[in-house]
Amino acid sequence: MVLNFIRGGPVTGRFAPTPSGRMHIGNVYAMLGAWLSARSRGDRMLMRIEDVDKPRVVAGADQLMMDDLHWLGLDWDGEPMFQSQRTERYEYALECLRSQGVLYPCFCSRADIRAASAPNEGDGFMVYPGTCRRLLHDHPDEVRARLVRGDQHSIRIAMPESAAGEKQRTVPDDSAALSGAVPPEQQGDAGIVDGVACFNDRVYSPQHYDLAREVGDSVIRRADGLFGYQLVVVVDDLDMGVDDIVRGRDLLRSTALQMWIRQCLLAGGFEPECGNTEKPLAEHPEYAHLPLIDNAAGRRLAKRERSLDMGALRARNVTPEQIIGYCAWLLRLQPTPIPCKPADLLADFSWEPLRANHLDRALKPDDPTTPQWLAEALG
């Protein structure tokens, strides 16, 4: 398969909520950003329900989230995609990666990894120390014996080494040749060169991650058999033709990893079920990562904070326009959080105000910019 990778033309954005509970203000803020990014250019917006992690799924949460989005005035095109219905596609993707020789079994428990690694400040991303990669390199017979014995294991994807990397590649394949072939300036501001993933984020400007040192070999199939988030979102975005991704800045590092997975999939012959036939598939999507929204204590908003979820706010008779107006203010699209509709923001939408001021924000009841309805919800 030959793919032409270009920029320009219509784009496809997506909502990708996890049905683990009711949406809160922080979720709506991200959803509004994604919707405006696509709709301001007259482009497609799709819906994906990320329900692959079955233990986290709350029954009925998907319908509540879609109802809340309709109530807010945030629409999408076509029918929703459900990850729970796509196991065959993920199995196929796994085989494409396996053909590239970039996968290996990992027998480490979470406790083992926590003991050997330290999370990165800011996003909590934990770089795997490569224990089982070294085991495969130094003692392949032991690995084979453990697999035959049926020892529980996850599957990891190996990262390419940077030019400065000193670790020996332990997965016997030629996939290192996948990286570094095309300079970033020829890849639409995004690419992987000498084991370094580069992309020009529309909010946080150019980003560079050494995949081996700053990302590390990552799980794409868990020990319990469930497919990993990092794999399924790449497969889904390829199949949906998504090339406009908006999400929180805590996923900046994950973007580098997903670029590598995407590149390996396409090199392994992955054939996307792309519904967007108006232009050829982009090699890498465009990205906008948003500042995080914290609670008054400085911790990131979570769905367990029920006073700020959509059910609680709607029960307080807060209007859609009040919520959208506040989220527009969080996106730096208006100087004060005055009520408005999503459509009111389309004509003047730009990432430039947020790019110029992308500090995280905390929701505080005593802040003079906090509207009364939100101050009351914050207690």
UniProtKB/Swiss-Prot annotation:
Keywords of this entry: Aminoacyl-tRNA synthetase, ATP-binding, Ligase, Metal-binding, Nucleotide-binding, Zinc
GO biological process terms held by the UniProt record: glutamyl-tRNA aminoacylation
Cofactor requirement: Zn(2+)
The EC number(s) this enzyme carries: 6.1.1.-
Binding site for Zn(2+): 106, 108, 128, 132
GO CC, alphabetical: cytosol
Family: Belongs to the class-I aminoacyl-tRNA synthetase family. GluQ subfamily.
Organism encoding this protein: Bifidobacterium longum (strain NCC 2705)
Protein name as it appears in the record: Glutamyl-Q tRNA(Asp) synthetase
Functional note: Catalyzes the tRNA-independent activation of glutamate in presence of ATP and the subsequent transfer of glutamate onto a tRNA(Asp). Glutamate is transferred on the 2-amino-5-(4,5-dihydroxy-2-cyclopenten-1-yl) moiety of the queuosine in the wobble position of the QUC anticodon.
Signal peptide: none
Enzyme class: ligase
Keyword Ribonucleoprotein: no
Renumbered residue ranges of the record's region Disordered: 161-188
Motif ('KMSKS' region): 300-304
Record motif 'HIGH' region, residues: 17-27
Chain sites annotated for binding ATP: 303
Pfam families linked to this entry: tRNA-synt_1c
One of the record's GO molecular function terms: metal ion binding
Manner of cofactor binding, per the entry note: Binds 1 zinc ion per subunit.
UniProt-annotated binding residues for L-glutamate: 14-18, 50, 229, 247
